[in-house]
Regions:
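Perimembrane helix-loop-helix junctions
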Residues: 221-226, 231-232, 252-283
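Interfacial juxtamembrane loops and adjacent helix segments
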Residues: 72-150
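Membrane-interface helix-loop-helix junctions at transmembrane boundaries of multi-pass membrane enzymes
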Residues: 176-179, 268-275, 357-379, 530-534
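Short acidic/glycine- and proline-prone juxtamembrane loop motifs at membrane-interface regions
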Residues: 200-208
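Short hydrophobic alpha-helices at membrane interfaces in multi-pass membrane enzymes
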Residues: 224-243, 247
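Transmembrane helical bundles and short interhelical boundary loops of multi-pass, membrane-embedded
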Residues: 265-266, 287, 298-307, 438-535
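Transmembrane-helix motifs of polytopic, lipid-linked glycan transferases
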Residues: 155-178
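Membrane-lumen/periplasm interface segments of multi-pass, membrane-embedded glycan/lipid transferases
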Residues: 288-365, 484-512
Length: 535
């Protein structure tokens, strides 16, 4: 591909919502649509926030215990007790393991049993952080503690969702138009549906996913920006690094993986010294944080031991399990909750179709920089679980769940989708080449179908989560099943004194998702339409 001229470079780095020349979409209309898009995203996110009860995400009994009693527990005012001869902390009864996870793993039971616990009484729990996680997330989450455990957890979930929308929205707004579209497409596709579930939860994985992607996308965008935009993007990258380093040890390590990937993606020059310094410092801090936490060690302590097998047999077991492991990013075999919400069928198939469509589209504009940066991230995604399995002498990809590597999936998509940098007359990087969406009748129909599948998959994923906890597990046909019921008719669980019922939440959340993807698809194609009109 040849270099673009200065006029195209200027267009590529134009301000958000800038009108196209001649008959382009007016800036005012573009801004109004962008605002409506943000509102739709917020509404859809809040529907995910309230879709499941307290304790519903993996190991949430541990996370709520750590939220109430962050380390060091001896200095934070928590009441210390014992349970089964071990040191325990006192938490509201509704957060004790036997109550908050009373429905976990039991597909047939709703979350009704969780309503029997009291916020007034205290109970001991052995589930609290004693060095497995970095300092930061639990200390911040403790600020949300209040008398009502439901309100505390919902407030934290809502904050995490709004934090992701605010930080990533700022990056998208500050990035040049070509890269802005690539960033939004990457996270929209890679986070369907599991990413949305974790981002809107109280699990530290929320910060891990937001921080990891913010660090990667903001750093990449800042290398193609100038002035205040560049400064703002560097600040966003720093914020992402802080989130990654204060949430999980593995997400802190991901900063190093991203730094290596960006070294391939971004041409070296004196101009990127600030970004290079930030990425190197963040990588060093991330490795240090990971070395001081015990998350990786805790994974190695459990699993299907195959120590009696040969080394090559263990390699085979790990590598052969990778296809199912990777499909876990879209909920296959590893759905929400304590893996007790099944996404096999419609949801995992629909999300897989969207991912495959975007991967196929990205192949039309590959470059050696894209390939090497994507291989770097893909190597970490597949290599880390396999190496852990080999070191632990068991097929660890069945234990080291896909959600641990999910933060890197959106980064992988971004490395493939990001357009090449544009250059001005002096050869200096200035913005990005346009992000091209499929054109022509077939291209537009295909784009519309992919967007429709995305909206349908998101709606179905939200429905299944609500149904699981409101009614218990319901058998659905395979591989495609769109059967629904009135979620407010006979439901056994819902938030006490909630102003709206589960059916209203699902309908509003699903419609908001439809509106959001429709507006996003229209705005993504804006630059291409304008350029076609100019010729």
């Amino acid at each position: 591909m040849g270099e673009v001229g200065p006029q195209e470079a200027q267009s590529a780095s134009s301000t958000p919502g800038a009108p196209g020349r001649g008959r382009g979409t007016p800036a005012r209309s573009r801004y109004l649509l962008a605002v409506l898009l943000v509102v739709a995203v917020i509404v859809a996110s809040l529907a995910w926030v309230v879709s499941s009860p307290v304790g519903s995400s993996p190991d949430e009994d541990f996370h709520v215990g750590s939220m109430w009693c962050p380390p060091p527990v001896d200095e934070t005012g928590c009441q210390i007790s014992t349970k089964d001869g071990e040191k325990a902390v006192m938490v509201p009864q509704s957060l004790a393991k036997e109550y908050v996870t009373c429905y976990a793993f039991d597909h047939d039971n709703s979350a009704q049993c969780a309503l029997n616990a009291s916020d007034e009484e205290l109970a001991p729990t052995l589930r609290w952080d004693d060095g497995n996680y970095p300092w930061g997330y639990y200390q911040f989450a403790h600020l949300f503690v209040q008398h009502s455990t439901n309100r505390a957890v919902l407030a934290l979930r809502a904050f995490n969702a709004l934090l992701a929308i605010g930080l990533l929205g700022a990056i998208i707004a500050l990035a040049d138009s070509g890269l802005r579209r690539a960033i939004s497409v990457a996270l929209t596709v890679a986070w369907l549906p599991m990413g949305f579930y974790f981002i809107t939860g109280m699990n530290p994985s929320s910060w891990a996913m937001t921080g990891t992607f913010a660090f990667a996308s903001a750093l990449l965008a800042s290398t193609r920006s100038e002035g205040r935009r560049r400064a703002g993007l560097i600040a966003c990258a720093l914020a992402g690094a802080v989130l990654a380093c204060t949430s999980r040890g593995d997400s802190a390590f991901f900063l190093f993986v991203i730094t290596v990937a960006l070294a391939f993606a971004v041409p070296l020059s004196r101009r990127i010294v600030p970004e290079a310094c930030l990425s190197c410092v963040a990588s060093a801090v991330g490795i240090w944080v990971m070395s001081r936490t015990n998350v990786a060690a805790s994974h190695l302590a459990s699993g299907s031991d195959v120590s009696g097998e040969s080394w090559w047999r263990i390699v085979y077991l790990n590598v052969s399990a990778l296809p199912n492991y990777l499909r876990g990013f879209v909920g296959y075999l590893f759905g929400p909750g304590w893996n007790d919400v099944s996404y096999q069928g419609t949801v995992s198939s629909g999300a897989s179709l969207v991912v495959v469509a975007l991967l196929a589209w990205s192949l039309r504009s590959l470059s050696w920089r894209k390939v090497l940066s994507a291989i770097t991230v893909a190597g970490a995604i597949t290599g880390v679980p396999v190496v852990i399995g080999l070191r632990g002498h068991f097929n660890n990809v069945l234990v080291y769940q896909p959600r641990y590597m999910l933060p890197l999936f959106a980064v992988f998509m971004l490395m493939l989708l990001a357009p090449s940098p544009a250059r001005d007359e002096g050869g200096r990087s200035l913005g990005s080449r346009p992000f091209r969406v499929p054109q022509g009748v077939a291209g537009r129909v295909g784009t519309g179908l992919v967007a429709a599948v995305w909206a349908l998959t998101n709606a179905r994923a939200l429905y299944l989560v609500i149904e699981r906890y409101a009614f218990g597990h319901t058998a659905h046909g395979m591989p495609i099943d769109l059967s629904t019921r009135n979620l407010s008719d006979g439901n056994e669980w819902w938030w006490p004194n909630a102003p709206v019922g589960p059916m209203t939440v699902w309908v509003v959340g699903a419609l908001a998702g439809f509106v959001a993807i429709a507006l996003a698809a229209y705005l993504w194609g804006g630059v291409t339409r304008e350029r076609l009109q100019d010729h």
